[in-house]
Regions:
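A conserved mid-domain beta-alpha-beta active-site/ligand-binding segment of alpha/beta enzyme cores
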Residues: 110-114
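Conserved acidic
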Residues: 58, 105, 153
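A short, conserved alpha-helix in the catalytic core of glycosyltransferases
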Residues: 30, 34-47, 52-80
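A short acidic, glycine-rich active-site loop
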Residues: 95-107
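Acidic/His-rich active-site region of diverse nucleotide-sugar glycosyltransferases
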Residues: 1-47, 51
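Non-catalytic, C-terminal membrane-associated alpha-helical segments of glycosyltransferases
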Residues: 122-182
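Active-site donor/metal-binding and catalytic loop motifs
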Residues: 71-72, 76-97
Length: 182
């Protein structure tokens, strides 16, 4: 996570699994994509998932809090998962690639990116994201959505960005405890 732009950072180049450097089976990460294992004690210590994120960034927030608690996270490059439903019928591939293929998800993506930044980065960096990067990304994502015939997606991205900026002005978001049962 780039603390100035809120763009994701990879510890290794964004390569297909087959093209990763030879011998790399574990590499450090703060992100916990679609399948992961965490000891229950660690899950409880960091408070589980923050359910206020709704739909996107909850895994990133969880991974970041694990790192802040002094634990390390790794991606096992030899593990395989099947993730069905990547491109549902009616979805535009370019919008799906950006994570903005559905209106509600788009709203949550734009809003939660700013909430995540407010929770995890310095105030100066939050201002950089909220006042420079978020408006620029709003223009970009809006343009891509309109170019793909989805002005509704553009409006939802704008609405989510504005809500995220307002949330940033309110202060750091609270942790909403996970409802996962013990």
């Amino acid at each position: 996570f780039n603390r100035w732009t809120s763009q994701p950072n990879d510890n290794l180049p964004n390569l297909p699994l087959e093209d990763l450097p030879a011998g790399v089976t574990l590499y450090p990460t703060t992100y916990s994509p679609n399948a992961f294992m965490v000891p229950r004690t660690v899950f409880d210590r960091v408070g589980g998932f923050n359910e206020s994120y709704i739909q996107i960034f909850e895994e990133s927030d969880f991974g970041w809090r694990i790192m802040e608690a002094g634990y390390e996270g790794y991606i096992l490059t030899t593990a395989r998962t099947r993730h069905y439903g990547f491109l549902e019928s009616g979805c535009v591939p370019e919008l799906r690639q950006l994570g903005i293929e559905k209106p509600f998800r788009t709203y949550c993506f734009a809003r939660n990116r700013l909430r995540f930044a407010r929770r995890h980065v310095d105030l100066l960096q939050v201002f950089s994201i909220a006042l420079i990067f978020a408006p620029l990304s709003c223009v970009y994502y809006g343009f891509v959505a309109i170019r793909n015939g989805r002005p509704d997606i553009a409006w939802k991205y704008l609405a989510g960005t504005l809500r995220g900026i307002l949330d940033c002005l309110k202060g750091r978001p609270k942790q909403v405890a996970s409802s996962v049962r013990r």
